[in-house]
Each structure stands twice: as structure tokens, then as C-alpha cells.
From Swiss-Prot:
Residues reported to bind NAD(+): 32-36, 81-82, 113, 136, 173, 290, 314
Keywords: DNA damage, DNA repair, DNA replication, Ligase, Magnesium, Manganese, Metal-binding, NAD, Zinc
Protein purpose: DNA ligase that catalyzes the formation of phosphodiester linkages between 5'-phosphoryl and 3'-hydroxyl groups in double-stranded DNA using NAD as a coenzyme and as the energy source for the reaction. It is essential for DNA replication and repair of damaged DNA.
Enzyme class (EC, first level): ligase
EC number(s) recorded for this UniProt protein: 6.5.1.2
GO molecular function annotation: DNA binding; DNA ligase (NAD+) activity; metal ion binding
GO biological process: DNA repair; DNA replication
Family recorded in the similarity comment: Belongs to the NAD-dependent DNA ligase family. LigA subfamily.
Pfam families the UniProt entry points to: BRCT (PF00533), DNA_ligase_aden (PF01653), DNA_ligase_OB (PF03120), DNA_ligase_ZBD (PF03119), HHH_2 (PF12826), HHH_5 (PF14520), Nlig-Ia (PF22745)
Domain BRCT: 593-671
GO cellular component: cytosol
Organism: Escherichia coli O17:K52:H18 (strain UMN026 / ExPEC)
Protein name: DNA ligase
Residues that coordinate or bind Zn(2+): 408, 411, 426, 432
Organism taxonomic ancestry: Bacteria, Pseudomonadati, Pseudomonadota, Gammaproteobacteria, Enterobacterales
Amino acid sequence: MESIEQQLTELRTTLRHHEYLYHVMDAPEIPDVEYDRLMRELRELETKHPELITPDSPTQRVGAAPLAAFSQIRHEVPMLSLDNVFDEESFLAFNKRVQDRLKSNEKVTWCCELKLDGLAVSILYENGVLVSAATRGDGTTGEDITSNVRTIRAIPLKLHGENIPARLEVRGEVFLPQAGFEKINEDARRTGGKVFANPRNAAAGSLRQLDPRITAKRPLTFFCYGVGVLEGGELPDTHLGRLLQFKQWGLPVSDRVTLCESAEEVLAFYHKVEEDRPTLGFDIDGVVIKVNSLAQQERLGFVARAPRWAVAFKFPAQEQMTFVRDVEFQVGRTGAITPVARLEPVHVAGVLVSNATLHNADEIERLGLRIGDKVVIRRAGDVIPQVVNVVLSERPEDTREVVFPTHCPVCGSDVERVEGEAVARCTGGLICGAQRKESLKHFVSRRAMDVDGMGDKIIDQLVEKEYVHTPADLFKLTAGKLTGLERMGPKSAQNVVNALEKAKETTFARFLYALGIREVGEATAAGLAAYFGTLEALEAASIEELQKVPDVGIVVASHVHNFFAEESNRNVISELLAEGVHWPAPIVINAEEIDSPFAGKTVVLTGSLSQMSRDDAKARLVELGAKVAGSVSKKTDLVIAGEAAGSKLAKAQELGIEVIDEAEMLRLLGS
């Protein structure tokens, strides 16, 4: 007679097998009623023997207790976004850039997938068992949605098959099929619940429930499309090969993934999917095109927040007609005056649209737009509403001309438009309340000074009450003054003060980015910080010297030079330093002169570090003249292997590359 343990093992194995056939292979062998019977049998046995329940049991998909709030998970490998193209010409230009950058006649094949309109998630398996899941968030840090993801039947709690890596992070999209979306809304209308505008909102709302039991009732599904962390195992050296391997391990992959041998085949795939879009049964907003070879991907690399080897080819946006009620003007962080059309509300691609950007005065002139006109609205990229054209044949008699302001609508300062630029700007600088608000919001944002708890509404109140005029004023705030703001109690106020104190310790690159210099994003700020090393050197740099920094041209160099030439900006920086803002003193990075065992070497980190974070380790290595790479190749000089080091360590040993452990790294860093 079988033991209880054997019965449980057999039932779990059988149920996982049928889940795989149903969700991955789309070839069920048994009817739903038989699956339900097996599940009931397993649940009854586990109820009688709770000490034998395992976390990966199919019964454990049922939602756990509600959470008070989501905790955060930091992505070990950032979840990058993709650049978009919207027409064949742009795609062909992307194709040419890839071919040119590879600088060879070697063949490029493309792996083409559906661009699902859902929520990007990261799922981590350790020894084949699902241990955590997170949203994309800002690409660096996401929300912990492990309990909710465990309720999604399409996602295996345990992988099956051979050669499963010790740690495998799968990336993919959670989405809601059209039938499930309609059922949810039908139930909501009947019970007076929330009706969702589109399947994507419904999927996001379902996945971000604090109560996993609610998520468990929603018919969410999942397709995987990539990998993040990979340790203690190997994967095929092509993107398609990896997807097929995922499928063998029980992970769902779209059956529309196609390998294309040329740009012409990619375009044919795009048009075929566009034609089939209405019959897919779920929402997509384009196709994703990736270089199939992992070796070629590595050579192409990344730019800022996106890979050079992939692009999202978006479908034409959906359009609707409505009327322009008025045109108002918004003022941005750099003083840019942006006209915004206030519309008669209309549903476009499932979203109620009441505003649309008009970009600038040239765009208004190009459109020939007047207030009161009937216009065609498009959600560009299915996200940002914009006015496509005016329906002149239906222009009402009482339309009014759009008059672009000569003075800032917020502070009254002169509006100027530099020759050769399309954007008109307020000249008020920080005396302009709108610019001040947006500049401060940028200054405290996560990727800048990262002041936790300092949200937009707090900044708005601080500016309106004239508590804060410059970024330096933020560090003069007291808990008592903050308590006077709306919805700000003593505890919350003290938390903000503590966060401001913590934010004083930053990096030179973050500080530069936080200053909000025109055209200086994160990548440029990092480049400037690495090249000049000190604030004094950067402030004294000429336009010619600035252009020696990689990817800095005449326009960016001029903006940086002009920013530091402005006395008011230098005063703000001095005030910030006086308030205690600081960063580690730079170590001169000169591979020929620096006395460091890492100087001039290409270093790869793998495995988990116990004494410092990987980010901190990378920063120290760079300070000491190393170039930190993400993968092992013949050009790698040194591999630092932490706990549970995987395929990178194996490859280093195969290539005969020097390998040291964390203890040796710390010793060398100290020397």
C-alpha cells in the first residue's frame, strides 16, 4: 500500500503534468472536471496531513492573507524598457543601425514576438522552485507580488525537466484575455463593483491587489519572453533557443514567436500579426523584434535605458473624433511652454481622453487648429493622446484663434523662443512657481537625490506656501514646519526629515542629474562625473573640454557650460554643499598611473556578495580604474566569484581567466 507521502507526490506530479499540457502545450489530455477531482483529492489529503504541505504544491496557488502594503524588491539585473518604432522606415533605420554597429557582413536573424499589453513581471526560481516575483517598477526596484503571482495557474510553482539552473529569473508579461476581461466587467456591473477601461488596467489592478485571494479569482495568464539572473546553469546561445528551453521546463511561451531571416520577413510577420490582431483573444500593441544571437546582442550592448539589439514595432494607434473646448499652456521643469488641448471627453483605445498635447506653436500652426474645432485624436503608442488633424469640413462658425502667450501663464515672465528651437520657454527660472515645482520634483526623485516620502503633493504645498524656493531649502525643513502641510502628521513629517538627511549622502553622478541641467540625463551625468571627477573641474570646463566626454556634443556641452556660468545656479550648488550634501571623494582613474590591482582591467562579478552590495562593489572597482562588464569573454581579465556563482564562473575557468573570491576582492580593495 502506498504511503501518504507517495500519494501526495503522485498527485502533485500528475497535476503539474496536466497544468503543463494545458497552459504550455495547449493540448489538455483530461477534461476540467477530472482536473478538479484530482485537485480536490490532493487538497483533502493535505488537509488531513498539513505537516506534509509543500510550498510548490498546486494547492498553494490559493491566495494568502491580505498584505498591509507591498514591500520592495530590487532587481539584480535591471528590467530595461525598449525603444519604439512606429513605421517601416523607422524599423529599417533600426535594422541598418544594427548592421552598421556589428561592422561585418555576418548574417543577422531576428526573433519576433507579440508585444503583449499587460504588466511586466520578474519571477525568480531557485533550484526550480518559485521563490519571489516582482513588478518592473522603475526598472531598478519593483513591488513584491509573490503571493499574487503564485495564484496564476499558467505560472509553474516548480519547474520540471533536466539541467534547471540553481537560480533563474524569468521575465514576462502577465495579461488578461479578452473573455476574462469581459467576465470581470460583467460581474462588476452586476454587483456595483469597479468596471475597468481595458484589459491592461484590469490585469494591473488584479495583480496589484493587497489581498491575493482577489487575484486568485481573476483569470490572469502569462507568457515569458526573457531572462534576468542566471546562476548555476547554462542556457542556449540564441534568444529563440532560450524560449524553447523555458517551454521544456514548463514555462508558457507564445506560439506566435517566429524566427525571421531578413528585414523583409520581419515586416511580413508584423503585417500578418496586425491582420490577426482582432482574433488573438488578448490585447497586443505591436511586435517585439530582437537580434536572435546572444553573442551579437552582447556586442551591440545598451544605450541608456534600452538595448541596441531590440525594438518594439508598435501598431498604428487607435483614433477617435472629438471637439477642442479650450487650449491651455503648461510650464515644465526647464521652462518649456507646452500647449494642451482640453477636449470633449472621448474613449480612445479603451481610455477616456480629455486632454491632448499640442507640443508647440509650430504644431498648432501646422494643424491650423482653432478652439472649437472638431479634431482626430490618437493615442500615440497607445499611451499619450495627441491631435492628429483638424476636420476642416466640419469646422463650426464660432471657432477662436489659439493665441500663444508672450508672458508666462504662471509667473508673468517674458516668453522667448531661441532661433532654431521649436519650444518657447519662460525666462523666469526659479522665480517661476511652475518651474520651481517641477525642478524640485525632479531633484527629489528616485534616480536623483532619492528622497523617500517626498511626493508631488508635498512639493506643491511647499512651493505654494513659499517654504521652499531652491533645492537647498529642502534641507532646512523641520518636522514642525512639515506638520503644517495637509495630510502630514508628526510621524510622517519626521520620516521626511530623516529621508532628507539620508539623501545628503549621494554620488557625484546623481547630484549632477538632480540639478536638472537641460539635456543631461542619467547616462550623460554619469559620463561627466567619471570624466571630470570633481565639481570644481566640471565647473571650470570649457565647451571644447566638455565635448571630450563620450556622447556629449556641442548642444549638451553648451547647456552644461551655460548652467555653471549662471551665478544663481552656482549659488544654489554652494547652498546645497553648505547644507551637507556630499559624495565620496573621487579616486583618479588613470590606468597608467593609479596603483591598483584593478586598474585597466575588465572585471566581471558573479554570484552573491555578503559584505557589500553588487552596486557598491561595482562603484569601488570603477573608482580604482576597472571596467566592470556584465558577461565573461576572452577580453575579461578577472572574475570575482561570490556565493552560488554559476555559468560565468564556469566559462571563466574554461577560458583560463583569473578568478578570485569575495574575501580576496575585499583585501585588494583595501590595499
